[in-house]
Amino acid sequence: MARSLRKGPFVDEHLIKKVLAAQGNNDRKPIKTWSRRSVVVPEMIGLTIAVHNGRVHVPVSINENMVGHKLGEFAITRTFKGHFGDRKA
């Protein structure tokens, strides 16, 4: 179910403050965040946001194709070790 257009996209307050400050200072340092639920907004384009995946912060470089998606979509939480070979006798 989509979010109402009347409400607008959800972005944690502390994250949007850091984004606006980084844009004002032209700071290229990655912004660390645990907020996987925040939506990528146009103000984030060109910045690098380090999204926590449960273990480490994964650096995500934001481009215009990511607008409207959630930050958590770009930081994979599970590691796939691969399927083992054929074990049939």
Curated annotation (Swiss-Prot):
Alphabetical GO biological process terms: ribosomal small subunit assembly; translation
Keywords in alphabetical order: Ribonucleoprotein, Ribosomal protein, RNA-binding, rRNA-binding
InterPro entries linked to this entry: Ribosomal_uS19, Ribosomal_uS19_bac-type, Ribosomal_uS19_CS, Ribosomal_uS19_SF
Pfam families per the UniProt record, alphabetical: Ribosomal_S19 (PF00203)
PROSITE patterns in alphabetical order: RIBOSOMAL_S19 (PS00323)
Gene Ontology molecular-function annotations: rRNA binding; structural constituent of ribosome
SUPFAM superfamilies, per the entry: Ribosomal protein S19
Record's GO cellular component terms: cytoplasm; small ribosomal subunit
Function: Protein S19 forms a complex with S13 that binds strongly to the 16S ribosomal RNA.
Family of the protein in this entry: Belongs to the universal ribosomal protein uS19 family.
Name used for this protein in its record: Small ribosomal subunit protein uS19
Organism: Vesicomyosocius okutanii subsp. Calyptogena okutanii (strain HA)
Origin organism lineage: Bacteria, Pseudomonadati, Pseudomonadota, Gammaproteobacteria, Candidatus Pseudothioglobaceae
Gene designation per UniProt: rpsS
